[in-house]
Amino acid sequence: MSSRVHKVVLAYSGGLDTSIIVPWLKQNYGNPEVICYCANIGQDDELSGLEAKAIATGASKCYVEDLREEFVRDFLFPLLQSGAVYERTYLLGTSVARPLIARRQAEIALQEGADALAHGCTGKGNDQVRFELTYMAFAPHLKVIAPWREWNIRSREDALDYAAEHNVPVTATLKSIYSRDRNIWHMSHEGGILEDPWQEPEEAMYTLTTAPEAAPDEPEYVTVGFDQGVPVSVNGERLGPVDLLLALNNIGAKHGIGRVDLVENRLVGMKSHGVYETPGGTILRVAHQGLEQLALDRDTLHYKDVIAHRYAELVYYGQWYTPLREALDAFVRVTQRNVTGEARLKLYKGNAMLVGRRAAKSLYNPDIASFTMSDSYNQKDAEGFIKIFGLPVKVQALLEGR
């Protein structure tokens, strides 16, 4: 299983798994120096006391970096512009975060002169792929240690026993039945009752959003402004990326916006059942789509939907740092040049309804589209168009003797 390493940088969250990995690495890899790395991408109170906790478990130091601005600006907003959604509903909150975390972890490892990288991803999940593909892109020569593919710990009970045996301070209990991942974009829930896809999740599971039934009885209107596809304002107030997303999270959560229940196809071959809460991201997606309806011509809009599907797969599969993603981003950037304007949404009991949109360079022309008589569109022209457009249908019918 193991071979001696001298210094390892661990992707660290402070949860049960990564807490016990610190002494496990020392025990199984020749007592190396263990450096913990944690990226602040919007976990909030989960980061409280993290450095002290890492040291208490045996780490020599712990980096905690605030990457929220970069995460929103360089990852979430390009994702939004692309229109990527995995398997029709998942807004990719966990998937898109891993490349940034793993890249900075690898950069810290190179800076520290480490000879190994470690993560706490299970051998059944997608995250192991996302982390390790990023390691390959930025530190291909470093050894990768994935304890869940090596150790004999097979359950939460085993992990808690190991923590107690090695005096690792943890707050987890057997009552903590859900596996969660949180960042500024979303909260994910797996495990527990969700392992039966027929069972409705209990309301107590949700941590970000109000139940639609308990949401305000009056709708709330919110206007989101965009500049070339990038969100820049909420209700007329210009905000930076982080503040803008936080504002929309608060507004959306209050109205129960952004709950998704999904049985998804994991990259590693199995299906899994998860529930996601993405209040601000859902508002942004609906608003952005509404503005694109005005700004994009038919062919570009339709082909962009094709790109969005592949972009979603690329993000889900951990292929962020690839030429394909850069090439698709170049295409998306061109499509966003005229996506400047505002979209207005009506939020009510779990629904985010587009009720208005206006663009600086809108392709919608009311003089042409109106049902009233207009000199801008000669309806007689449609006759010749239909004859040409329908010619293949007519020829096929004649061939078959109809």
From Swiss-Prot:
L-citrulline binds at Y90, S95, N126, R130, S179, S188, E264, Y276. Its main location: cytoplasm. ATP binds at A11, Y12, S13, G14, G15, L16, D17, T18, S19, A39, G120. Pathway: Amino-acid biosynthesis; L-arginine biosynthesis; L-arginine from L-ornithine and carbamoyl phosphate: step 2/3. It catalyses: L-citrulline + L-aspartate + ATP = 2-(N(omega)-L-arginino)succinate + AMP + diphosphate + H(+). CDD domains: ASS. GO terms for cellular component: cytoplasm. One of its GO terms (molecular function) is argininosuccinate synthase activity. It is found in: Cytoplasm. Keywords: Amino-acid biosynthesis, Arginine biosynthesis, ATP-binding, Cytoplasm, Ligase, Nucleotide-binding. GO terms for biological process: argininosuccinate metabolic process; L-arginine biosynthetic process; urea cycle. The keyword Ligase applies. Its EC number is 6.3.4.5. The keyword Transferase does not apply. Belongs to the argininosuccinate synthase family. Type 1 subfamily. NCBIfam families: argG, PRK00509.1. Homotetramer. This is Argininosuccinate synthase. It comes from Roseiflexus castenholzii (strain DSM 13941 / HLO8). The gene is argG.
